[in-house]
């Protein structure tokens, strides 16, 4: 594949990932959060394990000490993140969810500086400040009274917690893979499996008999889309892109996800876009770019090389 074709494929992947916010918003109207988490990764399992068995036959089954880090990563980065992600979509818009989700590299960098003495360059500091300012605009929609009265949308706060979970996953996965000799594909496959196992009792707790009979084809197709296009195909294309054009250049394409989400949210879901949300989106994307651009060599770009899983 030429670099141009890889770039086009990464644009397509950004559309896949942005579509997960749209289909997630559709699906939460019919399924509770734990059920969506369970079914999304249950449907993805056959595909991701087939890829693991074909590409890395030596990594088919974890050995001894490899299980504990996989359990921790599966719990924090897959189960907790996606349960919170789907919960947030019950209360907030797909636009807000995607813009707050775009903060992942920023929060990852912030935690790396705070807990792992990661170096904070001027461009990364500016990126942090801009991104937090942008999310402030998105959450408040320019209404400063929300701040003084501490009245924030529940879904926005839940999504912020979800991003923190994924940032912790990002930092831990980088270290665990080096320490326990885990490949990105092996981590992805087994965190999917662990998520399915952990979410199953919660899925039963939500009493599936009360809602499964009334679910529609669009609800199931939304889950299937998230499983195949956002989780499996998105991962594969990102992995190819990292091999062809490198992790830093691949990470830049994540900045397109909020843009495509805004377009799809307006055209498909009929969500409204205010001037403050557009301003917030521009500021967030600028901040993320400053933090993830190749020259910055941020924690996020290093993480992209070792763990190719996206927040959608």
Residue ranges and their predicted role:
Residues 14-18, 73-82, 105, 139, ...:
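Transmembrane alpha-helical core positions of polytopic small-molecule transporters
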Residues 14, 37-39, 78, 82, ...:
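Helix-helix packing/entry segments at the starts of transmembrane helices
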Residues 16, 20-21, 49-101, 137, ...:
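Specific transmembrane alpha-helical segments of multi-pass solute transporters/efflux pumps
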Residues 5-9, 35-51, 72, 127-133, ...:
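Hydrophobic alpha-helical transmembrane segments of multi-pass integral membrane proteins
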Residues 27, 36, 40, 88, ...:
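Hydrophobic/aromatic residues within transmembrane alpha-helices
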Residues 23-26, 30, 44-62, 133-149, ...:
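Membrane-interface helix-cap regions at the ends of transmembrane helices
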Residues 1-11, 57-58, 105-164, 282-312:
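Juxtamembrane helix-loop boundary signature in multi-pass membrane transporters
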Residues 20, 42-47, 100-114, 129, ...:
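Alpha-helical transmembrane segments of compact multi-pass small-molecule transporters, enriched
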């Amino acid at each position: 594949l030429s670099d141009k074709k890889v770039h086009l494929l990464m644009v397509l992947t950004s559309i896949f990932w942005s579509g997960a916010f749209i289909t997630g918003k559709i699906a939460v109207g019919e399924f509770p959060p734990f059920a969506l988490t369970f079914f999304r990764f249950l449907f993805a399992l056959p595909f991701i394990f087939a890829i693991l068995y074909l590409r890395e036959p030596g990594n088919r089954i974890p050995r001894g000490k490899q299980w504990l880090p996989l359990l921790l990563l599966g719990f924090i980065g897959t189960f907790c993140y996606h349960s919170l992600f789907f919960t947030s979509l019950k209360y907030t818009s797909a636009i807000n969810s995607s813009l707050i989700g775009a903060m992942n590299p920023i929060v990852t960098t912030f935690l790396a500086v705070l807990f792992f003495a990661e170096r904070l360059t001027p461009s990364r500091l500016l990126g942090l400040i801009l991104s937090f300012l942008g999310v402030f605009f998105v959450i408040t929609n320019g209404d400063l009274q929300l701040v003084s009265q501490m009245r924030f949308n529940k879904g926005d706060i839940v999504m912020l917690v979800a991003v923190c979970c994924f940032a912790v996953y990002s930092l831990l996965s980088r270290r665990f893979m080096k320490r326990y000799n885990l490949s990105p594909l092996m981590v992805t496959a087994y965190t999917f499996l662990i998520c399915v196992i952990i979410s199953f009792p919660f899925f039963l707790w939500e009493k599936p008999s009360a809602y499964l009979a009334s679910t529609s084809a669009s609800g199931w197709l939304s889950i299937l889309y998230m499983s195949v296009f956002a989780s499996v195909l998105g991962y594969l294309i990102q992995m190819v892109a990292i091999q062809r054009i490198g992790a830093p250049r691949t990470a830049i394409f994540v900045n397109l996800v909020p843009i495509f989400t805004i377009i799809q949210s307006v055209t498909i879901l009929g969500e409204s876009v205010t001037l403050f949300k557009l301003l917030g989106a521009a500021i967030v994307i600028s901040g993320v770019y400053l933090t993830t651009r190749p020259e910055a060599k941020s924690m996020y770009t290093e993480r992209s090389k070792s763990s190719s899983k996206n927040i959608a």
